[in-house]
Regions:
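Predominantly soluble domains enriched in secretory-pathway, periplasmic, or organellar proteins
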Residues: 22-441
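Bacterial N-terminal signal peptides
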Residues: 10-22
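Short helix-onset patch at the extreme N-terminus, typifying the N->h transition
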Residues: 7-9, 273
Length: 441
């Protein structure tokens, strides 16, 4: 077919105008971010592209990636999505089970692996680093992306622990190792403790916490770091308590004389939103499905319980795990890790709550009259839960069936509905954690 001169000009103008106005059938079908899953079965990281239209996940180029160590358990994205850090717990170290046969000695120790994130979500390994304690359990970064923290189960020198008794191993404390993050390369440099020295007069290379640390969180304002811990039960190290550090550009200082006791039976997770701090009590004496303990942060980081106190989780779930609050601060979602292994066992699910904008009080979604949370479907044994960078979708990565499960978030009601095309996506074996990185591509 041939066009006249005027026809060619008209066609060119139409194409130009359509392009300028963004009038194209696939204008919104782009990636809104990348989703990464750590898996312990093969020591891998699964990478996915998040589709804007449907929330579907498609593998990034060359995924999966080696985690840079053995037993990856946590990860985080820092510096506006430039860097991915993976915490490998290792094996065969103090207090750990023996390594499986065939694990190279170089991979047996715990480390933090640094990856750069490419334009299409691909990962490139850069370097690895070590925390200053034993058995790392979690990793966090401040909201500025300039400092990284690792929580270790035990210190290398127990004499630096407050309340340590040599005849009682339960009094060996944990620690937080702090690093500066280079904004250009992502490389880490250790921050020494300027407030505490060892018996030789040398500044510690870590910041001691209480005994039996379980998990920790940096509040969004970066002002405090809260660590939940089992504790030894002494006056200086109470059981089921929260250890508080004030954070000043990665330099940590005690802001409370002793850890803050809680009424919990079995603390398992902690999460901090812009306004509130939430603890999970997985104990079954009060409520078989666990409790949420909501707080505000007061003077010097002291936790003040919200009016109404603890909130029961859904009665049809078990093993309450990680949680997240949506970008509006309106809804809290809790991943229940019940394994879905038998028809009679409590099912894995997501509990949803509305957050009162004035009081912070949690109430179940959908106006349930029972006073317990409404539950939404999830894969088997979810280990993490997050909202995607476009604030449209909620995802969990599930240990028992090695999948990622997605749902659409109703921004008005908070209810979750299945993705329109596919709900479940296969990923690396035995997922342990998940993170997402936003993008404009």
């Amino acid at each position: 077919m041939k066009f006249s001169r005027f026809g060619r000009i008209g066609l060119a103008l139409a194409v130009s105008l359509g392009t300028g106005l963004g009038v194209t059938s696939c204008s919104t079908n782009h990636a809104v971010g990348y989703f990464y899953v750590t898996g312990s079965q093969y020591n891998q990281i699964g990478g996915f592209r998040i589709d804007n239209n449907l929330g579907n996940l498609t593998a990034t180029e060359n995924s999966p990636y080696a985690s840079g160590g053995y037993n990856p358990i946590k990860a985080l994205v820092a510096n506006a999505g430039k860097f991915l850090y993976v915490l490998n717990a290792g094996c065969g170290q103090t207090g750990q089970s023996a390594c499986p046969s065939g694990v190279p000695a170089a991979n047996a120790g715990a480390n933090i692996s640094l990856f750069t994130i490419g334009g299409k979500g691909g990962l490139s390994f850069q370097a690895s680093y070590n925390s200053q304690g034993n058995q790392p359990v979690s990793i966090q970064a401040d909201s500025s992306g300039t400092h990284l923290f690792v929580l270790d189960s035990t210190v290398t020198d127990p004499t630096t622990c407050v309340g340590y008794v040599s005849s009682n191993p339960d009094t060996i404390c944990g620690d937080i190792t702090a690093f500066n993050i280079d904004p250009n390369t992502g490389r880490l440099s250790l921050i020494t403790n300027q407030g505490v020295k060892n018996g030789n007069g040398t500044n510690l290379s870590y910041f001691p916490v209480g005994s039996g640390p379980i998990n920790f969180v940096v509040v969004p304002s970066n002002s405090f770091i809260y660590t939940i811990e089992k504790g030894s039960g002494s006056a200086l190290d109470p059981s089921q308590a929260v250890f508080v550090y004030a954070n000043n550009s990665g330099q940590l200082a005690l802001s409370q004389n002793t850890p803050i006791p809680t009424p919990a039976e079995d603390l398992t997770y902690i999460y901090a939103s812009a306004k509130y701090v939430y603890l999970i009590d997985a104990g079954q004496n009060v409520n078989a499905s666990g409790l949420i303990l909501p707080y505000t942060a007061g003077t010097n980081g002291a936790l003040q319980s919200l009016v109404g106190g603890q909130v029961p989780n859904s009665g049809t779930t078990s093993d309450p795990g990680p949680m997240t609050v949506d970008h509006q601060g309106k809804f809290l979602y809790l991943a229940n890790q019940g394994p879905n292994l038998t028809p009679t066992s409590p099912s894995s699910s997501v509990s949803g709550f509305f957050i009162d904008p004035t009081t912070g009080r949690l109430t179940p979604l959908s106006g349930a009259s029972s006073g317990t949370a409404v539950s939404f479907g999830a894969g088997s044994a979810p280990q993490c839960i997050l909202e995607d960078p476009s604030n449209q979708y909620l995802y969990t990565a599930n240990f028992a069936d090695s999948t990622v499960t997605g749902a659409v978030i109703n921004s008005t009601t908070g209810t979750l509905t299945t993705l329109r095309k596919s709900t479940s996506f296969a990923t690396v074996g035995q997922p342990t954690w998940c993170v997402a990185s936003g993008t404009l591509f």
